[in-house]
A protein has these predicted regions:
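Short, surface-exposed beta-strand/loop micro-motifs that present aromatic residues
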Residues: 98, 173-174, 180-193
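Short, surface-exposed loop or secondary-structure junction motifs
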Residues: 1-172
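Short, polar N-cap/turn motifs at the start of nucleic acid-interacting alpha helices
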Residues: 195, 205
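A short acidic/small-residue loop/turn micro-motif
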Residues: 200-203
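Short acidic, glycine/proline-rich loop/turn micro-motifs
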Residues: 14, 206-207
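Surface-exposed amphipathic alpha-helical segments
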Residues: 209-229
């Protein structure tokens, strides 16, 4: 109800305001249209066709040895539980958070994006559909805080003081970061992607962990770009 009642603070396409509300709403739309839980639909329609064997919502205990802890509860490490409180209230399955995946699976997904909807088994999504998601949807602007966005993806420029995509990724690049310390950036012009999975959120006593991770992300992206050139 709160999401339905929310009103835009700027016209579409005029300003970038990071928000989870649209993704939460999209997940609910999928649930209502299909009559099935979002995780069931995502597994059948996305994860299995892409061959993503270690991508899932609400991982069971058997997955815990493969999941880095991202928090502490009464002094004990906690892993395999979504950190986002809104997703937690939705049972751990939501359109904006709650998904766990391995580096190998994310790399396979990145290859799928680079090939514009195709993998070794054939084409799964139309090229024009993929391009609709990865093409910048906001006006190009420069300067501090001027972030660009595609549909569900961050685009360039990121508007950050230190870009998580570094300084060398091409203008058509797209990616996303995660609060717990994860990130994926894809450069179609270089046929390059960078996956960086950390558990930054597990360091409650570390100072400036978010700022430092931004710098690390940028440095890793630049190193990968130089290596590919």
């Amino acid at each position: 109800r709160m999401v339905f009642a929310a009103t835009p603070v700027a016209p579409p396409g005029a300003r970038v305001i990071y928000s989870d509300l649209n993704a939460i709403l999209l997940g609910e739309i999928v649930r209502r249209v299909t009559g099935e839980p979002l995780d069931v639909v995502a597994t059948r329609e996305i994860f299995r066709p892409l061959g993503l064997r270690r991508t899932l919502f609400r991982p069971g205990r058997e997955w815990l040895p493969y999941i880095a802890p991202t928090g502490l509860w009464r002094g004990h490490p906690v892993g395999g539980v979504v950190n986002d409180q809104n997703a937690a209230r939705l049972g751990g399955v939501a359109g904006h958070a709650g998904l766990f995946a391995s580096g190998t699976d994310i790399a396979r997904f990145a290859q799928f994006m680079l090939r514009e909807g195709a993998l070794a088994g054939g084409r799964l999504v139309r090229v024009e559909t993929l391009r609709a998601f990865t093409t910048r949807a906001t006006p190009p602007r420069r300067g501090a805080g001027q972030e660009a966005r595609a549909l569900g993806w961050q685009a360039l420029p990121t508007g950050e003081r230190v870009s998580s995509a570094g300084t060398l990724f091409g203008p058509r690049s797209f990616g996303h970061t995660g609060w717990t310390g994860t990130s994926l950036w894809i450069d179609p012009d270089r046929d390059l992607f960078v996956v960086l999975l950390t558990n930054r959120a597990f360091a409650p006593r570390a100072r400036r962990s978010f700022t430092l991770l931004h710098e690390v992300r940028g440095q890793v992206a630049d190193a990968a770009a130089r290596a590919s050139d």
